[in-house]
From Swiss-Prot:
Subcellular location: Secreted
Complex formation: Occurs as a mixture of oligomers. Tetrameric arrangement appears to be the predominant quaternary structure.
Pfam family, one: PLA2_inh
Protein name: Phospholipase A2 inhibitor LNF2
Protein purpose: Inhibits the enzymatic activity of phospholipase A2 (PA2).
Tissue specificity: Expressed by the liver.
Annotated source species: Lachesis muta muta (Bushmaster)
Length: 200
């Protein structure tokens, strides 16, 4: 699922782009109104990132419009099972010109526990979140762990930590960390095999 970059977009909102101009905004909900800004290399297309935190029947969605590189646009989607029946999901949608069409979230797949688990955590303002057992479902046989920082004037510097089950490990190293004028820093990216649950 070459999509680990997409998870990072939950917190780092990607870098700016090339000689074209794109809308730039962030908001809670399905859309946002912002301002147009010129992109700088190597970003060459306009895009939207849709992010969702789902827990049982409750979900919170955000939208982020920005300039993107075409490589990020190919990442598509990611679903991270962080445990306690909760998921972090991301969708990337790019276009040659505004407005970009929305890429909707399908319903979460109904799948059974598969006998594996991963450390689960979702932490903001900390890189050492309390871990709990995230029971993996369906094809989720890998564990991810991401720690990073985003530097903001308001509400201040944000440290984040994300752990959970995913279906596969994409190729990503710290050297690929996305930056936005040095405001984003990816400190840790780990992806390992999930742990088999002990038999009763």
């Amino acid at each position: 699922m070459k999509s680990l970059h997409t998870i990072c977009l939950l917190f780092i909102f990607v870098a700016r782009g090339n000689s074209r101009s794109c809308d730039f905004c962030h908001n809670i909900g399905k859309d946002c109104d912002g301002y147009e800004q010129e992109c700088s290399s190597p970003e060459d297309v306009c895009g939207k990132v849709f992010l969702e935190i789902s827990s049982a029947s409750l979900s919170v969605r955000t939208v982020h419009k920005n300039c993107f590189s075409s490589s990020i646009c190919k990442l598509g989607q990611i679903d991270v099972n962080i445990g306690h029946h909760s998921y972090i999901r991301g969708r990337v949608n790019c276009c040659e010109k505004e407005p970009c069409e929305d890429q909707p979230f399908p319903g979460l797949p109904l799948s059974r526990p598969n006998g594996y688990y991963c450390p689960g955590a979702l932490g903001l303002f900390t890189e050492d979140s309390t871990e709990y057992e995230a029971i993996c479902h369906g094809t989720e046989t890998k564990c991810i762990n991401i720690v990073g920082h985003r530097y903001e004037n308001f509400p201040g510097d944000i440290t984040y930590n994300l752990k959970g089950c995913v279906s596969s490990c994409p190729l990503l190293s710290l050297s690929n960390a996305t930056r936005e004028e040095n405001r984003n820093y990816l400190q840790k990216v780990e992806c390992k095999d999930a742990i088999r649950l002990a038999s009763l």
